[in-house]
Amino acid sequence: MSALTPPTDMPTPTTDKITQAAMETIYLCKFRVSMDGEWLCLRELDDISLTPDPEPTHEDPNYLMANERMNLMNMAKLSIKGLIESALNLGRTLDSDYAPLQQFFVVMEHCLKHGLKAKKTFLGQNKSFWGPLELVEKLVPEAAEITASVKDLPGLKTPVGRGRAWLRLALMQKKLSEYMKALINKKELLSEFYEPNALMMEEEGAIIAGLLVGLNVIDANFCMKGEDLDSQVGVIDFSMYLKDGNSSKGTEGDGQITAILDQKNYVEELNRHLNATVNNLQAKVDALEKSNTKLTGELAVANNRIITLQEEMERVKEESSYILESNRKGPKQDRTAEGQALSEARKHLKEETQLRLDVEKELEMQISMRQEMELAMKMLEKDVCEKQDALVSLRQQLDDLRALKHELAFKLQSSDLGVKQKSELNSRLEEKTNQMAATIKQLEQSEKDLVKQAKTLNSAANKLIPKHH
């Protein structure tokens, strides 16, 4: 990657200002943000210069704005995907201290600020995304509640703080995607706050609003009374998305741990559902026992009443037989009255007998239902025990995998240390080899000199021998 500032003999104030401005917008203009699988890639653009040329060339503003929109959209994709995956793996309600959630709000803030028109005030120009968010309550009546809540928060003093609080409340309400879609569909209202080529006015804004639907599966809870939203600095942390070269070593072990964690969470959720079902069945059994007790009491009362009616019937039969005997000699009119009384008594007895049969039938149904509920409870308790055993086994496997991962990491560190020692030994051997090669060269040179001297002495000796002869 090339340096941000080219070497110059003497830095000038103009060069420093231009370099500083370029460094502040480096993530939007100097690089193109793209995704490689699940990772973030920053690619340098060769056609952007950070120092003024002798004859400055004007960059196309539409191209730069389109590049910024694409970068912000890719960052939003990565942030939303990472937030959903980490939240589901975490398996609990998120709070304001959760790092992926903080980065998501920072990315959303940058998206809402892109192409924002500056408002002139007494203190100068001011850019705030609180104005567009206030429009949502006019488009979606449900948003009026969170807008009023934001305005009532005592610790918020700036429009930026109100906008940040609004985003957090909308996420808690699980309506952020709906609100953003309603806002983006009203571009005639957004044109008052944004430039024509801003992210909220283009297709990238609609894509981000669609991606926000996935956040409805996340449960978040924020306490904004003690949180300083006015003075927070919204800086995107690229280190959360950049790919680490050494991260692929433990991918397989991490994948196994993730799979076991998913199984563990599934079994725990299933166990909670089974416990809830057992509690519901227990409540139904209790209600059936109370109903059974009540019906048993009613049956006893009905039996007593039937016995009383049978005794009364016997007494009426005796009286009727006595009356018949006595009325054989009496007037015919008295016999007719006694017959009517007897028929009424028989009718009353028939009704009471039918009532008793109905009560006994209902009691038998309640008893059979109770037996079925007890059988279902036993089966559910057996299923719960099996799931708990499976959960214990999965936890043991998770502990074993974690121990294996630590052992592999220790072995990897040991192997790295051994490789380092071998490389140092190799370098020392190479150094000794070079020294020995130099020594051999010196010895060869000395040998050549000795051979030369021997030849000289031999020739001198040959010259001296003839002279003696």
Curated annotation (Swiss-Prot):
Positions of post-translational Phosphothreonine modification: T5, T12, T51
Gene Ontology biological process: actin filament organization; cell differentiation; negative regulation of axonogenesis; nervous system development; positive regulation of axon extension; positive regulation of cell migration; positive regulation of intracellular protein transport; positive regulation of retrograde axon cargo transport
Residue positions where Phosphoserine is found in the record: S34, S49
Record InterPro entries: RUFY1-3, Run_dom, Run_dom_sf, RUN_RUFY3
Keywords: Cell junction, Cell projection, Coiled coil, Cytoplasm, Developmental protein, Differentiation, Lysosome, Membrane, Neurogenesis, Oncogene, Phosphoprotein
Disulfide partners: none
Sequence ranges assigned to domain RUN in this UniProt record: 95-227
Pfam family, one: RUN
An example Gene Ontology CC term for this record: filopodium
Residue ranges the record marks as coiled coil: 271-362, 422-463
Annotated localization: Cytoplasm; Endomembrane system; Cell projection, Invadopodium; Cell projection, Growth cone
TM segment ranges: none
Reported modifications of this chain: Phosphorylated by PAK1.
An MF annotation (GO) of this entry: dynactin binding
Functional description taken from the UniProt entry: ARL8 effector that promotes the coupling of endolysosomes to dynein-dynactin for retrograde transport along microtubules. Acts by binding both GTP-bound ARL8 and dynein-dynactin. In nonneuronal cells, promotes concentration of endolysosomes in the juxtanuclear area. In hippocampal neurons, drives retrograde transport of endolysosomes from the axon to the soma. Plays a role in the generation of neuronal polarity formation and axon growth. Implicated in the formation of a single axon by developing neurons.
PANTHER family named in the record: PROTEIN RUFY3 (PTHR45956:SF1), RUN AND FYVE DOMAIN-CONTAINING PROTEIN 2-LIKE PROTEIN (PTHR45956)
Domains (record comment): The second coiled coil domain is involved in the interaction with GTP-bound ARL8B.
Assembly behavior: Interacts with PAK1. Interacts (via C-terminus) with Ras-related Rab-5 proteins. Interacts (via C-terminus) with Ras-related Rap-2 proteins. Interacts with PIK3CA and PIK3R1. Interacts (via N-terminus) with FSCN1; this interaction induces neuron axon development. Interacts with DBN1. Interacts (via the second coiled coil) with GTP-, but not GDP-bound ARL8A and ARL8B. Interacts with dynactin/DCTN1 and the dynein intermediate chain DYNC1I1/2. Directly interacts with DYNC1LI1.
Name of the protein described by the UniProt record: Protein RUFY3
Species this chain originates from: Pongo abelii
